[in-house]
Swiss-Prot record:
CDD domains: NT_ClassII-CCAase (cd05398). Keywords: ATP-binding, Hydrolase, Magnesium, Metal-binding, Multifunctional enzyme, Nickel, Nucleotide-binding, Nucleotidyltransferase, RNA repair, RNA-binding, Transferase, tRNA processing. It catalyses: a tRNA precursor + 2 CTP + ATP = a tRNA with a 3' CCA end + 3 diphosphate; a tRNA with a 3' CCA end + 2 CTP + ATP = a tRNA with a 3' CCACCA end + 3 diphosphate. Its cofactor is Mg(2+); Ni(2+). InterPro entries: CCA_bact, NT_sf, PolA_pol_head_dom, PolyA_RNA-bd, tRNA_CCA-adding_enzyme. This is Multifunctional CCA protein.
Length: 368
């Protein structure tokens, strides 16, 4: 039995980056040997075990063969006679196809170290084209390592175009697609992810509503530069699309509710946000009510952040509308409902009276 660190742990150590999760590979062992050594089986599709003390995952070396459509259409074979090289060749990129033994010796049968030095994302073998999910994974790695100067190798981009043209991307489930998009959005340069997808034809297959033009991606780039959360980044990406298109994208990818809500509200209200300084008090009140700023102030704050990131992406140095709208929200929230309740108002009458008082507060705010 031989145990190796594989994949990202080896790659990131060689790049001098922090290593968080470690994937372990076991060569030359049987399921029975693993169980006898106290490992607990957890793999549903192929033999994966949890270490009895650390709880880390250890996978038996395996080969795979394409047996159906999509990223799940593979038959796996795990046995003690599967070699380290046979296991590594099934991996996506050469930089992910290195192994390190317990003595620290690195095994690099597919020249991953050379590609690290050349800053290239290159596929290991032609079998790369059998898994459509790899198109998204490579684009995500391009976004992650763009600050280090990495790019997708020309021959790998050609294979990604082949996958995009084959229709195999349509076999990806919404959940798997969103998982990759979500992870890509949180990278340092998420705009690179969408540029790579555009370059290989995958964006047209997965997100035909999206234009990868600089104006759209500039807002996302600003959001990433300012370390904004996922929902803000998603709304920045979709801003500028008509609400019907935003709704279609949200539903097709099954984005989380928080992301869907902010993207939809941004699509519906971005123009009002930009025109805030000229809006009458009635329109201001309507905008605040639409965001339910009284009960959900953070959602409105996230909207203002999207507006600011979009403005910065368009070349604006500041966004004075944000502070103006924050002041308006504070003025409306400051209205005390207690006197209205004490006056005996209830139900619809109370709601109308409260609305009227908030309108007066906004008018006073505008007068300064």
């Amino acid at each position: 039995m031989h145990i190796y660190k594989v994949g990202g742990a080896v790659r990131d150590r060689l790049l001098g980056r922090p290593v968080s999760d470690i994937d372990w590979l076991v060569v030359g062992a049987t399921v029975e040997e693993m169980l006898a050594n106290g490992y607990r089986p957890v793999g549903a599709d192929f033999p994966v075990f949890l270490h009895p003390k650390t709880g880390e995952e250890y996978a038996l070396a395996r080969t795979e063969r394409k047996s159906g459509r999509g990223y799940g259409g593979f038959t796996f074979h795990a046995s003690p006679d599967v070699t380290l090289e046979e296991d590594l060749i099934r991996r996506d990129l050469t930089i992910n196809a290195m192994a390190e033994d317990e003595a620290g010796t690195v095994y690099d049968p597919y020249q991953g170290k050379n590609d690290l030095d050349q800053r290239l994302l290159r596929h290991v073998s032609p079998a790369f084209a059998e898994d459509p999910l790899r198109v998204l994974r490579v684009a995500r790695f391009a976004a992650r390592y763009a600050p280090l100067g990495f790019r997708v190798a020309d021959e790998t981009l050609a294979l990604m175009r082949q996958i995009s043209a084959s229709g195999e991307l349509q076999a990806l489930t919404a959940e798997r697609s969103w998982k990759e998009i979500e992870r890509a959005l949180m990278e340092v340069q998420p705009q690179v992810f969408f540029k790579v997808l555009s370059a290989c034809g995958a964006l047209q297959e997965l997100l035909p509503e999206l234009d990868d033009g600089s104006r759209t991606l500039a807002a996302l780039e600003q959001a990433a530069a300012h370390e904004q959360p996922l929902n803000v980044r998603w709304a920045c990406l979709l801003r500028g699309l008509p609400p019907t298109s935003i709704k279609a994208v949200n539903q097709r990818l099954k984005a989380p509710r928080e992301c869907q809500e902010l993207a939809m509200l941004t699509g519906e209200c971005l123009a009002q946000g930009n025109q805030a300084l000229e809006l009458p008090a009635t329109a201001l009140l309507e905008l605040l009510q639409k965001f339910d700023v009284y009960r959900r102030p953070q959602r409105f704050e996230d909207f203002l952040t999207v507006c600011e990131m979009a403005a910065r992406g368009d070349g604006e140095q500041g966004y004075p509308q944000a502070d103006y709208l924050r002041g308006a929200a504070a003025a409306a929230r400051a209205v005390d409902v207690k006197p209205l309740v004490q006056a005996g108002l209830t139900g619809q009458a109370l709601g109308e009276a409260l609305k009227g008082e908030r309108l007066k507060a906004l008018e006073a705010y505008q007068r300064g």
